[in-house]
């Protein structure tokens, strides 16, 4: 899949988001945040909404963020975004990028119908085509089976430190 024009028998089309989709991508990112944190949409602050819209616009314009939308008859039913990070070569792998998947979100009424798989396949294909070394993500418990079925594995070597505000 190239990331544009991928479709399923269900009539869902995955397409690359354009700059004219920035507001939609930001709104769907807020829905993703509300879903994974079990919030109502109104519980996401205006500051977070505004910062999200600014981030999406700035990052799409710079090329640091790519997003794809899943649509059914023109209506958005899913979103996935990818942050590309330039990385230095190693003796075993000189490819220049790692990808970090964010916002893999599917509308609740379209879950378990293959939309998430279409979005994931699209973002992985983009990584392969553009010389990414790896693609990683943080998974919800519900998302683990999808990612495992696509070949993703947990990495016990990853260590992180959350810094206080």
Describe the residue ranges of each PLM region:
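A short beta-loop-alpha structural element at the N-terminal edge
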Residues: 13-27
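Conserved GNAT-fold acetyl-CoA-binding loop/helix
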Residues: 33-55
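A short helix-loop-beta-strand connector motif used in the catalytic cores of GNAT acetyltransferases and
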Residues: 54-69, 100
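Conserved beta-strand in the GNAT
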Residues: 69, 75-84, 100, 105
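Conserved catalytic-core motifs of GNAT/GCN5-like acyltransferases
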Residues: 84-89, 136-142, 148, 153-165
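Conserved acetyl-CoA binding element of GNAT-fold acetyltransferases
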Residues: 92-108, 157-160
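Conserved acetyl-CoA pyrophosphate-binding loop and the N-cap/start of the following alpha-helix
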Residues: 110, 114-122
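Conserved GNAT acetyl-CoA-binding A-motif
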Residues: 127-139
């Amino acid at each position: 899949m190239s990331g544009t024009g991928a479709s399923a028998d269900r009539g869902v089309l995955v397409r690359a988001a354009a700059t004219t989709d920035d507001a939609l991508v930001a709104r769907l990112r807020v829905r993703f945040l509300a879903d994974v944190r079990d919030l109502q949409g109104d519980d996401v602050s205006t500051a977070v909404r505004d910062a999200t819209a600014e981030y999406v616009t700035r990052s799409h314009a710079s090329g640091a963020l790519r997003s794809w939308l899943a649509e059914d008859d023109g209506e958005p039913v899913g979103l996935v975004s990818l942050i590309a990070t330039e990385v230095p070569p190693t003796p075993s792998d000189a490819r220049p990028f790692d990808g970090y998947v964010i916002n893999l979100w599917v509308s609740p009424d379209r879950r378990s119908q293959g939309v998430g798989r279409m979005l994931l396949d699209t973002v992985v294909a983009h990584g392969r085509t553009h010389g990414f070394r790896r693609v990683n993500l943080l998974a919800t418990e519900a998302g683990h089976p999808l990612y495992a079925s696509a070949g993703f594995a947990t990495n016990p070597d990853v260590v992180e430190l959350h810094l206080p505000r």
